Amino acid sequence: MRRFLALLLVLTLWLGFTPLASADVAGLVPCKDSPAFQKRAAAAVNTTADPASGQKRFERYSQALCGEDGLPHLVVDGRLSRAGDFLIPSVLFLYIAGWIGWVGRAYLIAVRNSGEANEKEIIIDVPLAIKCMLTGFAWPLAALKELASGELTAKDNEITVSPR
């Protein structure tokens, strides 16, 4: 029985492990080497008043990776060699979205303490909003400071619990 279980274990491990598969970039090739892309580039249409705008656009796309159809694809697997394609714009988007949210939160906290909070939520106090907006660029540091001090989160006794 021990030999049978040992043989079963060896077979399970041997058949269970698969060789490492490398998809690299899923069959994508540099656009400058793709015949379908070259065909599309030859028929480039100008999109602006610049007579060479179509050609310039395809020169920029030639640095990307193309599929069989000759269209550029985004590689979003975290490789730093392709950081300009997705990583940098996505981090910039998150920073700007956080800035907008932080400034909105700061504005609501500032008007909450005034006597006419409901009115200032509808009719925006522009000087106060600009003041909040100019301090919003450092929102990640301010958020960490408030998180460390406990000001960012609500205390347990301030959270209502459903009677269910």
UniProtKB/Swiss-Prot annotation:
Residues 1-23 form the signal peptide. InterPro entries: PSI_PsaF, PSI_PsaF_sf. GO terms for biological process: photosynthesis. It comes from the Bacteria. It holds the Pfam family PSI_PsaF. Keywords: Photosynthesis, Photosystem I, Signal. One of its GO terms (cellular component) is photosystem I reaction center. Transmembrane segments: none annotated. Belongs to the PsaF family. PANTHER family: PHOTOSYSTEM I REACTION CENTER SUBUNIT III, CHLOROPLASTIC (PTHR34939:SF1). This is Photosystem I reaction center subunit III.
